[in-house]
C-alpha cells in the first residue's frame, strides 16, 4: 500500500480520524514554515475550510504543500472532510484539489468520521492502490 498524507487543523478532527484509520500516514505541519517532501505516490486527506464557500476551502498549509511540484507530481487521489452545515460546499476542498491536480475525489466524511467512514476509507484505499500501479 502506498502513502497517505493529511492535514489537520488545531481542532484535530482529521488527526483523530487518521489515528482511528490506523494506516501509515504523514502529517502536513500546522506551522507553514515547516515543509515536508513526499517521495512516493500518496492519497491526500484534507479538511475543508471557509464556512461553506469555495474561496478559502483548501487550508493554506495544503496549498503550500501542493505548490511544491515534487509533492504535487505524486498525488493520486483526495479524501475530504468537512461539515454538513456547509451544504453544497461540504467537503469542497476535495473537489477543488481533485480538479486542480487532475486526480479522483475518492471519499468525504464529516468532522471526525464514523466507524462506517473508517471502514469505507480503509477498504477504498486498499482497492485504489491495488487498481493503480504504484509507479503511476
UniProtKB/Swiss-Prot annotation:
Matching entries from InterPro entries are given as: Flavoprotein-like_sf, RNR_Ib_NrdI_bac, RNR_NrdI
Q: List, in alphabetical order, the GO biological process terms annotated in this UniProt record.
A: protein modification process
Per its UniProt record, what SUPFAM superfamilies does this chain match?
Answer: Flavoproteins (SSF52218)
Give one GO molecular function term. Answer: FMN binding
> Which PANTHER family does this entry report, sorted A to Z?
PROTEIN NRDI (PTHR37297:SF1)
Family note: Belongs to the NrdI family.
Q: What does this protein do?
A: Probably involved in ribonucleotide reductase function.
Name it. Answer: Protein NrdI
Amino acid at each position: 500500500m502506498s502513502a497517505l498524507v493529511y492535514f489537520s487543523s488545531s481542532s484535530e478532527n482529521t488527526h483523530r480520524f487518521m489515528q482511528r484509520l490506523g494506516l501509515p500516514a504523514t502529517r502536513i505541519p500546522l506551522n507553514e514554515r515547516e515543509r515536508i517532501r513526499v517521495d512516493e505516490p500518496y492519497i491526500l486527506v484534507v479538511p475543508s475550510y471557509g464556512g461553506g464557500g469555495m474561496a478559502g476551502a483548501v487550508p493554506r498549509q495544503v496549498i503550500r504543500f501542493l505548490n511544491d511540484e515534487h509533492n504535487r507530481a505524486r498525488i493520486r487521489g483526495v479524501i475530504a472532510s468537512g461539515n454538513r452545515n456547509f451544504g453544497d460546499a461540504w467537503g469542497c476542498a476535495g473537489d477543488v484539489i481533485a480538479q486542480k491536480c487532475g486526480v479522483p475525489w475518492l471519499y468525504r466524511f464529516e468532522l471526525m468520521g464514523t466507524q462506517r467512514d473508517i471502514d469505507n476509507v480503509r477498504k477504498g484505499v486498499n482497492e485504489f492502490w491495488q487498481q493503480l500501479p504504484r509507479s503511476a
